[in-house]
């Protein structure tokens, strides 16, 4: 796993870092970030990287208000193929997994993600333990 800490610091040129968001959900808060199949996921990630994204964030569960939670199995079946496909086409880009679940974070990290974006701020009691071991 690459050391992404320098990339996460402020850029020397003063410009902000850019995160490209790829949601593999049918009900994402941002409709334009939704990707419905692996080919579209890869096309979207490659385009974002070519347009200047510093990293790609992959999410498999909508965080929009009123969204129904998905099972761990459904989330995994959405994000793992996406992460693996992005990693195969963009081997040097940083990939984050957007999840609130430690099980998904662990599988994603094992499948090529580099960091975790947890909007629940580690509310899953296992998340911190999972992150300590990476």
Residue ranges with predicted function:
Residues 132-134:
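Conserved small/polar residues in nucleotide/adenosyl-binding loops
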Residues 28-30, 55-80:
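Glycine-rich, proline-tolerant flexible connector loops at the mouths of alpha/beta enzymes
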Residues 93-100, 114-124:
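Catalytic beta/alpha-barrel core
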Residues 40-58, 110-111:
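Alpha/beta enzyme core
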């Amino acid at each position: 796993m690459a050391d992404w800490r320098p990339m996460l610091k402020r850029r020397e040129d003063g410009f902000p870092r850019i995160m490209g968001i790829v949601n593999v959900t049918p009900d994402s808060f941002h409709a334009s970030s939704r990707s419905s199949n692996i080919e579209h996921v890869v096309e979207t990630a490659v385009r974002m990287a070519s347009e200047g994204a510093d990293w790609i964030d992959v999410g498999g569960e909508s965080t929009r208000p009123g969204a129904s939670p998905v099972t761990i199995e459904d989330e995994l079946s959405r994000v793992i193929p996406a992460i693996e496909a992005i990693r195969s086409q963009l081997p040097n880009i940083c990939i984050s997994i957007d999840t609130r679940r430690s099980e998904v974070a662990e599988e994603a990290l094992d499948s090529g993600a580099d960091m975790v974006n947890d909007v629940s701020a580690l509310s899953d009691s296992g998340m911190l333990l999972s992150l300590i071991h990476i």
